[in-house]
Structure formats: structure tokens, C-alpha cells
């Protein structure tokens, strides 16, 4: 089964409940909502309330215990993991970087990411300035785990990597926490302007 080409990343949760394998307690019970393209859906709640668990169900890091999740009307269990995850740009709470250049990090996970998309993604993620300030620019080597860049720079590169995939759905799991106020505001403004046709899901603490 594949996604309908003409559709644009609408997500629907239908009576979704979830508990971890072997657990008695449900973390999520009877969740119903729709997230549409061109809209931002925010998940706000205290630590441990299940926000991250909920969004981790969309790329199928876990499967629902009951109910179903649809993307463009198709149950995500009927679609290959490859096709599902190609449709999603996901930024986890702690964005991981790998040893290699900034370019190889930004193009990781996307099969055919062009230089144009890479540069645009870095611009939206407010990463262009600090990348340009480095002598080798996008060819700058990153240490394993990103130990030679700051927390805010690491987060911006993780955001740029997700954006470079040019997906229809973008999920940000508390992904702006290491950014200063000014950078955060600029990044949110750029995301709203540049990704106005995408489906955005944002977890906030």
C-alpha cells in the first residue's frame, strides 16, 4: 500500500490507546484528533504526560495498543516503514550528530537531498551564520555525538537535517529547548513562513 499522491500529510488519531509492552497502565487512552496540512498542532503538558509517546507513534517507533493512526486516510500499519518515514521530518528532544561533515549530517536520512534543499534547510533552522563562520563551511568535520559544537548549534543542525528531507509532515519534540530566545523566535517565524503547506506537530514543555 502506498500513500495517495494528491494528499498532503493529514494525520488522524482514531481512538488511540497505548501502553508499553508488559505494562498495566495505559499512557494514552482514547486519543482522537486531526492534524491538517497548513496547520500547527501543539502538544502541551507536564513531563510524563505522554506527549513524546504520542508523537513517537506516528513514525511507528512504537505501535498503538488499540485504535488506529491514519495519514491521508491510510492506516500507517499498512504502509512500509520506509515510505512512512520518508513522509516525516522528525526532530527528537536530543538531536544526535554523527562523525562526518556538516553536509553529510544534514543529508543523512534523505535519499536524494539536493544542495539547494540543504542550504534552504540550514537557513530556516538559523544555522547558516555559524556554518559560514567556520573555515570549511558545510565541509566542516563534526565529532561523533557533535561534541565540537554547542548545544544550540547541535539542535539547529538536527532541525536542518529534518527540514532538508522536504517532507509533508514535521514533528518537533521539544526541539527548541537549547536555543536562546532570539534564535527561537527567528526559527519559529521562518518555519511558519516556509513550511506553511506542511503539517506541523510541536511538543512543548
Sequence positions of predicted segments:
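ABC-type nucleotide-binding domain
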Residues: 4-205
Amino acid at each position: 500500500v502506498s500513500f495517495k499522491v494528491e494528499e498532503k500529510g493529514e494525520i488522524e488519531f482514531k481512538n488511540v490507546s497505548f501502553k508499553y509492552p508488559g505494562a498495566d497502565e495505559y499512557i494514552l487512552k482514547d486519543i482522537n484528533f486531526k492534524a491538517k496540512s497548513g496547520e500547527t498542532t501543539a502538544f502541551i503538558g507536564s513531563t510524563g504526560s505522554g506527549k513524546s509517546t504520542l508523537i513517537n507513534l506516528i513514525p511507528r517507533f512504537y505501535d498503538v495498543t488499540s485504535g488506529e493512526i491514519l495519514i491521508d486516510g491510510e492506516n500507517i500499519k499498512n504502509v512500509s516503514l520506509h515510505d512512512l518515514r520518508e513522509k516525516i521530518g522528525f526532530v527528537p528532544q536530543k538531536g544526535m550528530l554523527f562523525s562526518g561533515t556538516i553536509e553529510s549530517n544534514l543529508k543523512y536520512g534523505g535519499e536524494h537531498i539536493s544542495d539547494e534543499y540543504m542550504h534552504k534547510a540550514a537557513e530556516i533552522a538559523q544555522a547558516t551564520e555559524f556554518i559560514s563562520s567556520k573555515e570549511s563551511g558545510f565541509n566542516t568535520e563534526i565529532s561523533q555525538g557533535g561534541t565540537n559544537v554547542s548545544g544550540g548549534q547541535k539542535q539547529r543542525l538536527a532541525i536542518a537535517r529534518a527540514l532538508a528531507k522536504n517532507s509533508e509532515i514535521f514533528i518537533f519534540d521539544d526541539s527548541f529547548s537549547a536555543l536562546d530566545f532570539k534564535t527561537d523566535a527567528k526559527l519559529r517565524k521562518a518555519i511558519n513562513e516556509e513550511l506553511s503547506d506542511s503539517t506541523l506537530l510541536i511538543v512543548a514543555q
